[in-house]
Amino acid sequence: MEFEFDVHKIFLEPITKLDNNLIPPRRPLISSSEAQKQIMTVIDEIGKASAKAQRLPASITSASRMQANKHHLYILKDCTPKTAGRGAVIGFLKVGYKKLFILDQKGSHIEAEPLCILDFYIHESLQRHGFGKELFSFMLRNEQVDVQHLAIDRPSEKFLSFLRKHFNLWSTIPQVNNFVVFEGFFRDRKASVKKTPAKRTEGEIKPYSLTDRDFLKQEEGLPWPLSQAQINLNRASSLGSSPTRACSRPPPGEEDFVKSLRNCRPHSLQRAASSEQEDHSQRRRTSEMNLSRGLLAQKNGYSRYLSPPPPLLTQGPYAAAQIKEQQSRTDSSAQEGRTQDRPNGSNSQHQNDLISSKQHVQDLHMELAAGRTMSDLKEGQNATKSPWCDHPSYTVLGTVLNAAWVKKKQELRSTRPW
């Protein structure tokens, strides 16, 4: 294969070895940049010729691939007098080490990193002239490897016949990949080979890793919060002499929390950790709230009939004077209204009914406002009389009265809220 430039100026030896730096062992006769450019051109052209001869869709040898991988490229040039002008390239051989899993004669997988033949090409016009054997033998001497220890990547039928003719390699070991190895590959190897462990059966596969299985072996007791084991915390001693309650449960540790994740449902840890405090605080809050609401209702005389609250019975002498004055005003106004609107015969009857209802309401107010016993309520009633006793009230507490009584009382007041 001829080129426009002089090949003898960049390849000073018959067979030149190149690595990923694309620098020949002997310095070319031209500038380094120009020599680098010409070497890349040679590699690209011979790679295309090899792909065309092997009927490959793309070339597997190029300058960019050589720079990206740690491969060795042996280039053979023509030194005959007829090409003394510019020279010519006869062929090339590309090799490199690869890590492979190779089957032996027994079918066992063996991990090895042999020297592999990746690409081999001799120009069609110069084949069967001994150039291929010369190039191959030079590579074996330079790499210091035996031919039976090589692995060949997808060899063609011509290449296999070449190996049988010149190196007596006939029997191959079937492989599951695209590489071909011959018998004697595992004999007298200088490079170390390593057998891969046999595949485990399905019964030996477990859902946890070794670390998880060791962790599960340590779970002898019940996980938190079922276990009541006490955990000594070093942080409490370092922060100072803070008092601790004997009845309180120590906070969970990190190990207990991780263990509980395997046995507890979501949010169960949070509910279990705060259940005791929530129950205690809920009971205390409910009881105190109900008691405070009851006292407030008793104090204000709450009712659904929007009547003004009755005054407290224990308000002092000034409050007693106001109560008497209000009582006298109410009695006088009620008496005037009854004399003007009702006949004398019916006034006495209504007055008797009103007095009885007033007495009943007074007893109920006395019981709820002060929270006293029946004996204390009777003494307070004799000592101080509330003006609310003579005034009709809309507040109905305790017993349920009929509608006729309510209607009669509204007629006496001459005021209807509805």
From Swiss-Prot:
Gene Ontology molecular function terms on file: L-lysine N-acetyltransferase activity, acting on acetyl phosphate as donor; tubulin N-acetyltransferase activity
Top enzyme category: transferase
Regions of compositional bias (Polar residues) in chain numbering: 329-353
Region (Disordered): 237-292, 322-353
EC assignment: 2.3.1.108
Domain named N-acetyltransferase: residues: 1-186
Protein name per Swiss-Prot or TrEMBL: Alpha-tubulin N-acetyltransferase 1
Residues under site feature: Crucial for catalytic activity: Q54
Positions of acetyl-CoA binding: 120-133, 156-165
Keywords: Acyltransferase, Cell junction, Cell projection, Coated pit, Cytoplasm, Cytoskeleton, Membrane, Transferase
Predominant location: cytoplasm
Family membership noted in the UniProt record: Belongs to the acetyltransferase ATAT1 family.
Domain of life according to the entry: Eukaryota
Substrates-to-products reaction catalysed: L-lysyl-[alpha-tubulin] + acetyl-CoA = N(6)-acetyl-L-lysyl-[alpha-tubulin] + CoA + H(+)
One family name in Pfam for this protein: Acetyltransf_16
Lineage of source species: Eukaryota, Metazoa, Chordata, Craniata, Vertebrata
Statement: the UniProt record of this protein carries the keyword Transport: no
GO CC annotations on file: axon; clathrin-coated pit; cytoplasm; focal adhesion; microtubule; spindle
Entry's localization field: Cytoplasm; Membrane, Clathrin-coated pit; Cell junction, Focal adhesion; Cell projection, Axon
